[in-house]
Regions:
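Long, highly hydrophobic alpha-helical transmembrane signal-anchor segments
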Residues: 45-89
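Transmembrane alpha-helical segments that form the membrane-embedded catalytic/substrate-channel core
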Residues: 57-67, 96, 100, 185-209
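Histidine-centered catalytic micro-motifs
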Residues: 63-73, 100-113, 199-205, 226-242
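Juxtamembrane helix-capping/reentrant segments at transmembrane boundaries
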Residues: 75-95, 113-126, 210-223
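Membrane-helix boundary/juxtamembrane motif in polytopic membrane proteins
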Residues: 154, 183-185, 207-217
Length: 297
């Protein structure tokens, strides 16, 4: 009887964001601590550059998952604190939280639609080694589609003012090289990782619109820790309110349902032409789209 219920949908206990000091809160404050320590280590304690750089990469990697959960209101049950987590993570990454949220929700509404899925261009608009640069398209998409609500334009302006102020002060007081090498370059590294594991690998070959087939899972306990659950990306698309640390148990709870729906449950990069297609995307990645696409159901 229990398995029959699981074949219908995900169990309810996975759906709601918990309150308290949950993993997203822990990751957020860990990221803040890492950035603070690396900054003090560089300027005050003569830490080696590679330690400061690595600490900032890890901090931004953690922030990338927190902002993602916050955009779905699944970082924390308290909406105000969820927004704080989202805005704080966005500032660490150099993002604007309302842009990330509205554009990301458009991705969920139009997965693999060349015209309306903003992440489709991020994944397929050129070589993978330039995927981080294509995240700037999100800002263009945000304004072109006029996606803002209520005070989100003000929030965008303040976010951009924050970054601009740091850059101006860095130029004025001679620490721009630190900003470039220990903030922007780590953000570039994390941007490549986000583009690869949040956008490219889960949705390739970018053709399916069916909700059960427009993303994939590739189960792995190790990857679940390293890329913070994004190897269960289909689970996230089917039930976006699940926090990242519940993707793996939610996957195993719903695996009979995913099997019945013939969902893609492997990475498939080494299968036949997929490997050569991946190499093409790494170095060139240009695609030509027809006007017809597979409909969702």
């Amino acid at each position: 009887m229990q398995s029959a219920e699981m074949l219908l949908t995900v169990p309810k206990e996975y759906l709601k964001a918990p309150g308290g000091f949950n993993p997203n809160v822990t990751m957020f404050f860990s990221a803040l601590s890492l950035i603070t320590l690396s900054t003090c280590g560089y300027w005050l304690w003569s830490w080696p550059d590679w330690i400061c750089f690595s600490a900032n990469v890890l901090a931004l990697h953690l922030s990338g998952t927190v902002i993602h959960d916050a955009s779905h209101n699944s970082a924390h049950s308290n909406r105000t604190f969820n927004a704080i987590l989202g805005h704080g993570s966005a500032l660490m990454l150099g993002f604007a939280f309302p842009v990330f949220t509205r554009v990301h929700l458009q991705h969920h509404a139009h997965v693999n639609d060349p015209e309306n899925d903003p992440d489709h261009f991020v994944s397929t608009g050129g070589p993978l080694w330039m995927i981080a640069a294509r995240f700037f398209y999100h800002e263009i998409f945000f304004f072109k589609r006029q996606l803002w609500r209520k005070y989100e334009l003000l929030e965008w302006f303040l976010s951009r003012l924050f970054v601009a102020t740091i850059v101006i002060f860095a130029c004025q007081y001679g620490f721009i090289s630190y900003v470039m090498n220990f903030w922007f370059v780590p953000a570039l590294v994390v941007g490549i990782a986000l583009g690869l594991f949040f956008d490219y690998l889960p949705h390739r070959p970018f053709q399916e619109r069916n909700r059960w087939k427009n993303a994939r899972v590739y189960p792995s306990t190790l990857l679940n820790l390293l890329i913070l659950g994004q190897n269960y990306h289909l689970v996230h698309h089917l039930w976006p309110s699940i926090p990242w640390y519940k993707y793996q148990p939610a996957y195993y709870a719903t695996k009979p349902l995913l099997d019945a729906k013939d969902c893609e449950q492997s990475l498939g990069l080494l299968q036949g032409k997929n490997f050569w297609s991946f190499l093409y995307d790494v170095f060139l990645g240009i695609r030509f789209h027809s006007h017809s696409s597979k409909s969702s159901s």
